[in-house]
Amino acid sequence: MIGKVVVSVASILLIVGVAIGVVAFINKNGDANLSPQMKAVQGICQSTSDKASCVKTLEPVKSEDPNKLIKAFMLATKDELTKSSNFTGQTEVNMGSSISPNNKAVLDYCKRVFMYALEDLATIIEEMGEDLSQIGSKIDQLKQWLIGVYNYQTDCLDDIEEDDLRKAIGEGIANSKILTTNAIDIFHTVVSAMAKINNKVDDLKNMTGGIPTPGAPPVVDESPVADPDGPARRLLEDIDETGIPTWVSGADRKLMAKAGRGRRGGRGGGARVRTNFVVAKDGSGQFKTVQQAVDACPENNRGRCIIYIKAGLYREQVIIPKKKNNIFMFGDGARKTVISYNRSVALSRGTTTSLSATVQVESEGFMAKWMGFKNTAGPMGHQAAAIRVNGDRAVIFNCRFDGYQDTLYVNNGRQFYRNCVVSGTVDFIFGKSATVIQNTLIVVRKGSKGQYNTVTADGNELGLGMKIGIVLQNCRIVPDRKLTPERLTVATYLGRPWKKFSTTVIMSTEMGDLIRPEGWKIWDGESFHKSCRYVEYNNRGPGAFANRRVNWAKVARSAAEVNGFTAANWLGPINWIQEANVPVTIGL
């Protein structure tokens, strides 16, 4: 859909010329008779996925000012999004009392995510201001939110199991999806160009989706992946001396460094983390359930709400609402402090994939350390997530995620996982976010009889120019104890393309002999393998068959081919790292 985003630098400069009033855009037919207003409209719409729709939307706007035109486009997108939200609500009303529990659940969820989309779009419009050339460092955050607005709409569709209902909702929300896609294109090209030109940035590679200049030759960490219940160890890159990603704020880095197992953290012990709430099953804290502590955290919090969860098995489903931002929860160890629940699409009445998750994080700035998250539905439950993270800039260290199908749902935003364990069978690391998972043990389990295993399933349908995809770096992929005797007969693949532009990069990772030589699997009934982006680089182990992979996946031969997928680049912008004021390696 957004393949057209990758346009030439010359075209970008022409568009920027319109945006800053330096030159006038002449369309490709050389029509100099266009009015100044239509020249500006044509310039703004040049790189959009649906140019006709873009021009039709902006044609009535009586202005040639790109700021006013783009603001008008965003307001029109909001109007269409409101119509889509109303449509999903009215669909539920029209179905009346005969509606099935699952359809009611999914339409209720649709109403919720459309509300989130409208809230975020309103925030984007407010943050845009009157002069987009002054948007500065906010541009990357706004682009991320805008991608989220699109993802919320597809969340609704992805959760619908009934074909007729999915078709009806898909047709009803089609216009808002088209306008949102065009808005992302405009931000990715025109607005980004305006901001960069104003800041006198002469490097336009990031606006064209090109791969950044290669860094130094890769340095591979050959040491074993750490156990999340064991001592901490250093990451490959984008890490300061405390082992915390440098794009995390200074205060949060100090907090994560302090928070060891229990309230006393630090490698030497003795450093006390000042918590807001303590959860304990034995009543020694303020609350006995995790949800009670989450509910007690303030909404729209500028600081951190810190929850210490004492050792215990907490059998509950925890929902962190969108307004409960900046929550940090930590426990006594990934096997000692565990949140567990049993909810699945196949076995639980009125459940969707999104609603199956044991922990559901809708808010931004979520952090977790020394925690376990589990869904006990089993392979017969089908989709059954241990955690679903929707919020941007999530940081999760030393945690464990156990399930079968769809264990770790990295659904939206930018997410960073380090030193974790993830277990599952089918698509057990999946979503539509920009996610980097480093130094993590990936455990493939034995599923139902005759079932194959797929580690990843990325859901990028916006285009290869977007930072949406899953990156595994310096991980280990191994079978669990029950699968080990059958690991050579049960087919296990690195992943399969869930959406058209599915993006997955696996580098510097050890692969056991359970991985099939072909590596990747086609999504049955779809042709997404023809347009996806699957890349392997510098992997090792008996499962790393570089010369026997499917011909639609790529085995990279140089650092230049994967440098754009490092934590610093994939989870950018780079100023997040620079503002941390610590040494950082940009490349591999």
From Swiss-Prot:
Main location: secreted
Pathway membership: Glycan metabolism; pectin degradation; 2-dehydro-3-deoxy-D-gluconate from pectin: step 1/5
Keyword ATP-binding: no
Cellular location(s): Secreted, Cell wall
Residues making up the signal peptide according to the UniProt record: 1-24
Residues annotated as the enzyme's active site: D406, D427
Function: Acts in the modification of cell walls via demethylesterification of cell wall pectin. Plays an important role in growth of pollen tubes in female floral tissues, possibly via enhancing the interaction between the pollen tube and female floral tissues by modification of the cell walls.
Name of the protein this chain belongs to: Pectinesterase 4
Organism name: Arabidopsis thaliana
Lineage per the UniProt record: Eukaryota, Viridiplantae, Streptophyta, Embryophyta, Tracheophyta
